[in-house]
């Protein structure tokens, strides 16, 4: 061993001692350990970055299920259409990992559509938007039948089946382009902008209408395949004045303790499974019940056979309606006693746990994400339209509250994305008929270029990886994100505001990949601020939002959704929207 190698060897005890103060940190840095702050050494010549301009009637952002139907139906309605995706068509966001798609078929269920809507509302404790609940029931079967025609159910991989209707219609698809900005001119949408991951190129898209199919997002946690989802669409829309909602809710999917970061292992063969159709099966799942149990009694938690409890009963915790307590997961109705599995799904094998929930469980696997369809842009009607003229959203990018703020119907997420993509497309195409394509001003183009490339131009700064890890340490603890109380939320908020004010302006990037990470990190920080402030505002517990200091539902004051928007002075503003109403 040479002297250099010998000097870099350090015991754990010595490291912890050194890391305890500024002198220690300086010593650690001198030994060659990576530092959060460093000089930026770009691997590309910024002066050689090109610009490409694109024009279309309807611009669809996102290549998952919602994006597929948005592009196909906008084209079929007569609009020139372009689809742009950060990933690959059919391999973007959570779509490639969803293996159940709901279809309401009156011939295979005892529920009428009215009964289905009311059963969802009972489980969701009023948090669902009945217009969108009814919508998924009314249109899901038609979307499933189209997917059958395209070969969707023939393979565990979705690219080929998604590409079939796209190629048949000659729809332009641009992949591996990170959209960072939505563009508004004269009070309405005018397009979008971003950069290529594979070329040194900035893209500007002029469009009459934009449909966000960008999915939801999280904090790049271990265990759930959402590390390319960072609430990009929500943040871009918020920055141009769109209202967003649903930030206080949580998705409660657990991961596994063993190899917690191994998504493929943790979902026990689901990635290799062909998709299947599910029928009506109302439930009240994947809130923060397990998080509460871990908070009170410790962890890890071991999942038993289907229908078994989680061990000793724990007093208190999230409210579950009586009709959904101690139910087997094969019940078709809340009051079912015959134990028959829902149509379209096989009964679980003896001793088999639900997908991704076998063995010892670990929380936080989907940290930063809410229940599907319960966060995103606020719709002003049942056409997936936002408060920005010409801007629509579908799927997990739309805060439609389709099935509420708790997991109420298996397979509804994929179905809802298909249904909403089609509805948003038809509305966007109709909107395009009455307007002309706007010209994006040179001043806007220059400003956006500067904002996109800023991390590449910094001489020194913070690594987006380090800032993301810091964010995760602040937000993912069970006692911050899931089991909430005001003092902890405020404490976390102080750290997040520090990242917002001091670290975002100093993010650095050396190449196009790290540039993507820098923009994703900034989006996650803003989403974290929204989550904390909305959680502080909702002083009650309901569905997947639980407050230790307000453990009961407050139906007098909180039969309402929380909307968030950017004030005229740039500050984050909040408002209530009564359940069952449209925004004012």
Set out the residue ranges of the language-model regions.
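Glycine- and aromatic-enriched mobile tails/lids
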Residues: 18, 44-49, 54-56, 70, ...
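Mid-to-C-terminal Rossmann-like scaffold of FAD/NAD(P)H-dependent oxidoreductases
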Residues: 49, 254-347, 356, 361-373, ...
């Amino acid at each position: 061993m040479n002297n250099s190698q010998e000097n870099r060897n350090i015991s754990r005890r010595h490291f912890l001692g050194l890391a305890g103060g500024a002198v220690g940190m300086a010593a650690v840095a001198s030994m060659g350990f990576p530092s959060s702050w460093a000089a930026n050494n770009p691997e590309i010549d910024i002066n050689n970055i090109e610009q490409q301009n694109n024009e279309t009637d309807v611009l669809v952002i996102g290549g998952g299920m919602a994006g597929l139907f948005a592009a196909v139906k906008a084209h079929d309605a007569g609009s020139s259409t372009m689809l742009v995706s950060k990933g690959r068509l059919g391999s973007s966001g959570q779509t490639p990992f969803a293996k159940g798609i709901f279809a309401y078929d009156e011939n295979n269920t005892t529920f009428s559509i009215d009964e289905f809507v009311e059963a969802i509302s009972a489980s969701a404790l009023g948090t669902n938007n009945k217009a969108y609940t009814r919508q998924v029931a009314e249109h899901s079967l038609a979307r499933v039948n189209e997917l059958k025609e395209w070969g969707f159910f023939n393979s565990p991989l979705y690219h080929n089946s998604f590409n079939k209707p796209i190629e048949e219609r000659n729809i332009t698809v641009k992949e591996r382009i990170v959209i960072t900005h939505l563009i508004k001119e004269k009070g309405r949408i005018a397009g979008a902008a971003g950069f290529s991951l594979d070329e040194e190129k900035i893209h500007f898209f002029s469009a009459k209408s934009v449909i966000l199919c960008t999915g939801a997002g999280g904090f790049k946690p271990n265990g759930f395949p959402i590390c390319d989802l960072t609430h990009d669409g929500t943040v871009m829309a918020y920055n141009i004045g769109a209202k967003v909602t649903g930030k206080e809710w949580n998705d409660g999917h657990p991961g596994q303790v063993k190899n917690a970061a191994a998504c493929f292992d943790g979902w026990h063969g689901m990635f290799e499974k062909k998709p299947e159709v599910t029928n009506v099966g109302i439930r009240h799942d994947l809130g923060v019940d397990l998080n509460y149990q871990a908070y009170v009694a410790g962890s890890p938690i071991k999942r038993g056979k289907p229908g078994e409890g989680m061990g000793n009963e724990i007093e208190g915790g999230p409210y579950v309606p009586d009709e959904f307590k101690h139910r087997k997961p094969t019940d078709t109705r809340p009051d079912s006693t015959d134990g028959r599995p829902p149509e379209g799904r096989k009964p679980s094998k003896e001793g088999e746990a639900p997908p991704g929930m076998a063995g010892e469980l670990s929380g936080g696997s989907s940290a930063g994400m809410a229940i599907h369809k319960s966060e995103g842009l606020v719709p002003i009607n049942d056409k997936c339209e936002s408060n920005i003229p010409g801007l629509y959203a579908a799927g997990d990018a739309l805060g439609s509250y389709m099935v509420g703020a708790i997991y109420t119907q298996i397979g509804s997420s994929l179905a809802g994305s298909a249904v909403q993509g089609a509805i948003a497309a038809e509305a966007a195409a109709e909107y395009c008929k009455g307007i002309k394509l706007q010209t994006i001003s040179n001043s806007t183009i220059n400003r956006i270029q500067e904002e996109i490339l800023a991390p590449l131009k910094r001489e020194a700064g913070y690594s987006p990886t380090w800032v993301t890890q810091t964010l995760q340490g602040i937000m993912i603890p069970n006692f911050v994100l899931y089991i909430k109380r005001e003092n902890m939320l405020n404490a976390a908020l102080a750290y997040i505001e520090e990242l917002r004010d001091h670290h975002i302006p100093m993010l650095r990037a050396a190449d196009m990949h790290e540039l993507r990470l820098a923009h994703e990190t900034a989006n996650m920080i803003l989403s974290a601020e929204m989550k904390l402030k909305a959680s502080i505002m909702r002083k009650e517990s309901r569905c997947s939002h639980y407050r230790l200091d307000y453990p009961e539902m407050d139906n007098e004051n909180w039969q309402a959704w929380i909307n968030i928007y950017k004030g005229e002075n740039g500050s984050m503003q909040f408002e209530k929207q009564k359940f069952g109403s449209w925004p004012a």
